[in-house]
Each structure stands twice: as structure tokens, then as C-alpha cells.
């Protein structure tokens, strides 16, 4: 999995799949570290930390998150999992964010179908309860390999834009799309995905309107919509973090 995902740490599938992707990787790395008494640990690797902090960076506010591809538009993730991940990679950002997601509630570990994750969550409830709730992130977050860019300003504007290509994980034909939020309220939205059916993962996936470029914040050029495939991609995608500038050629 580490060799499959991009080194920049972004999750193409979005925050709603993060718990099954980077979150599950964290579980396995924790088992590996615990089983070897810390002798084998990857938590110091910058890539692993970036994979964790993707959750706090993708959180717009008031429950809304960046939702490219099949991702849900709401849901910040499991606070206990985010806290444990943050503690392992020494990310104050993640630990504060986990407390922020609780919104004043007491941490509560549910006994789900993942015994390891449930037991680990039980062990950190008290620590999370003591953490300072805070959601702080840089004004610009740029994932150069995945080509995701998040920018915000002091006036409450948050822009999420992407380059990419049309054969990503849980792909939509959406190379070059963007979403805009004002004071955490979605203004220019990504419609996301409907209820999964057999068609969603079959040969007729791109007959579903939510998968088509026409229903993203993208132009139809000369009556032609974007097509599915590795070769249909954005090019010359750049982000100037200092000047808060993002550009991509579709």
C-alpha cells in the first residue's frame, strides 16, 4: 500500500475512505511497532505524517470536507483514530483536530467489528479528553503528485482544486475541477456520489450523471465532455504557495 499511494500523502478517495486506507495502514504500523518493541517503526517518515494530516487539511469546517471522487461531503473522521495516529507521528495538528471534532463531547470508544482498533481507542480516551480542541492548518496545502490544492484566506474563503487524471481511485471524470466554500458553507459544490449500485462499479459507471464532467465545475468545450481513461488528464498543474496561485491546463 505504501508503494501504491502518492508520496505527498493525499488520499484520492477522500476523507470518507481514509479510515480504510491511511487509517488502516496506521493500525498495521502500530502492530508492527508494538510487536517489535519499537525497533521497526515508520512513524518518523514524513510521508506517513502527511497521510495522517490529510484529514485535518481536508476539513473545511462545520462538518464539511473536500469531497473529490466518491467521497462524502460531510464527516471529519473518527476522532480517536485521528488522535492515535497524530500521537504516533508526533502531529500536534492531528491531536488538536481530533479534540476539535468531539465538539465538547466526551470521547467514547465503540466496540465495532475491528477489535484491535476498538481496544486501542479505549486506551486513549483519557488522553484525548485532555487535548486542546483546535483546528489550525496552513493557508495553502499542496499535494504535488496527487495534484490537490487547498487555499483559504482570512475572509472565510476556502478553495479546493485539483488537476489529476480520469482513472484515479473511485474516479470521476473531473480533471481540473474545484469547489468553493465561504465561511464553511459550500457555494460551488461537488455533487459527490449517489448510493452505490452494481452500475457504480460496472462498465456503465460513466453513464451515471455524478461521474460525468458535465456535473462538476468544469466547462464543456465544443460540446465535448471529459472521457474516462489514464490518458485524459490535466497538464502543467502548478501551485505557488507563496502567492496562493493554482493553475492547471485541461
Task: Please state what every model-predicted region is.
Residues 9, 146-147, 192:
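Glycine-centered flexibility sites
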Residues 166, 245-250:
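Acidic, contiguous internal or C-terminal segments within carbohydrate-active enzymes
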Residues 20-188, 239-241:
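Carbohydrate-active enzyme catalytic cores, enriched for enzymes
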Residues 158-240:
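Catalytic core of carbohydrate-active enzymes
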